[in-house]
Amino acid sequence: MRQKAVSLFLCYLLLFTCSGVEAGKKKCSESSDSGSGFWKALTFMAVGGGLAVAGLPALGFTGAGIAANSVAASLMSWSAILNGGGVPAGGLVATLQSLGAGGSSVVIGNIGALMGYATHKYLDSEEDEE
């Protein structure tokens, strides 16, 4: 039930940010590629969601634990060294392991899609400044 609530909340945030209006900026209606912004954003969201779902297991954060000789194992080692011998609860490594072990693909995909959309908006705002 909690995963469904988190997933719905992330979908709400994603839709809220997609429909936001930027105050103080004028958009040119004479743009030659009008309408392509949606498809460009959708592409970033699909790539971000796909990478997030496939990325955690590829880094070594699996359902069976942290895979040996992986990036996740190195992160865990560095985290333990920096924190005096133990990995802190609620830290980056613990959070990623929790998502890799028990997080549903839907939640991870939503987070990745949100990150993809944020990347799109950042790159789009840089193009507007030029």
Curated annotation (Swiss-Prot):
Chain's role: Interferon-stimulated protein that plays an important role in innate immune response against a wide variety of viruses. Inhibits flavivirus replication by preventing the formation of virus-induced endoplasmic reticulum membrane invaginations, which are double-membrane vesicles that flaviviruses use for their replication. Has an antiviral activity towards hepatitis C virus/HCV by inhibiting the EGFR signaling pathway, whose activation is required for entry of the virus into cells.
Family: Belongs to the IFI6/IFI27 family.
Endoplasmic reticulum in keyword set: yes
GO cellular component, one term: mitochondrial inner membrane
Record's protein name: Interferon alpha-inducible protein 6
Recorded topology in the membrane: Multi-pass membrane protein
Domain of life: Eukaryota
TM ranges: 4-24, 41-61, 75-95, 99-119
Compartmental location: Endoplasmic reticulum membrane; Mitochondrion inner membrane
UniProt induction comment: Up-regulated by type-I interferon. Up-regulated upon Dengue virus type 2/DENV2 infection (at protein level).
Gene Ontology molecular function: molecular adaptor activity
Principal cellular location given in the protein's record: endoplasmic reticulum
Subunit (UniProt): Interacts with CIB1; the interaction is direct. Interacts with the chaperone BIP/HSPA5. Interacts with RIGI.
InterPro entries: IFI6/IFI27-like (IPR009311), IFI6/IFI27-like_sf (IPR038213)
Modification(s) after translation: Glycosylated.
UniProt keyword annotations, A-Z: Antiviral defense, Apoptosis, Endoplasmic reticulum, Immunity, Innate immunity, Membrane, Mitochondrion, Mitochondrion inner membrane, Transmembrane, Transmembrane helix
GO aspect biological process, one term: negative regulation of mitochondrial depolarization
